[in-house]
Amino acid sequence: VTTLTKLVLYTERDGRAQFREEQVPLASGTPQSMLSVAFPSSGYQLRYSPIGYRSQFHCTPRPQWVFVLEGEMEIGLQDGSSRVLKAGGHCYAADSLPPGATFDSKVHGHWSAQRGADALVTLFVW
């Protein structure tokens, strides 16, 4: 079965955001057009971030797919690691604040930033 690699941003038991990769089976369709199962969604939002944009540490408000449409996006974690997503890149962001926790910018969440010579355009689907 052909698969698609899904980058997942999630919250570990210690409350810190981490990256992991999962495989999404593309088990239907034709050899020229392999398809995954249909995933439910309830909305989407487009975002434009100018050159130089960088957020503060924050948690994902709700699990959502992030697709980079134009430019490059870097996502950084508390441990100093980061990933750069180029146009066409994607990530499933699910690093929500643990139940009962109070947000601590030195422990929880991730930051995101525009990288490269072009503004960043992203699509969020939840």
Indicate residue ranges for each PLM-predicted region.
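Glycine- and acidic-residue-biased ligand/ion/polar-headgroup-sensing regions
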Residues: 61-79, 89
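Short, Lys/Arg- and Gly-enriched loop/turn segments at beta-strand edges
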Residues: 30, 83-85, 98-112
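Short acidic-glycine-tyrosine-enriched beta hairpin
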Residues: 79-97
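A short hydrophobic beta-strand segment most commonly corresponding to one strand
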Residues: 92, 102-126
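A short glycine-rich, His/Asp/Glu-containing loop-to-beta-strand
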Residues: 13-57, 63, 119-125
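Short acidic, Pro/Gly- and aromatic-enriched capping/linker segments at domain boundaries
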Residues: 1-11, 80
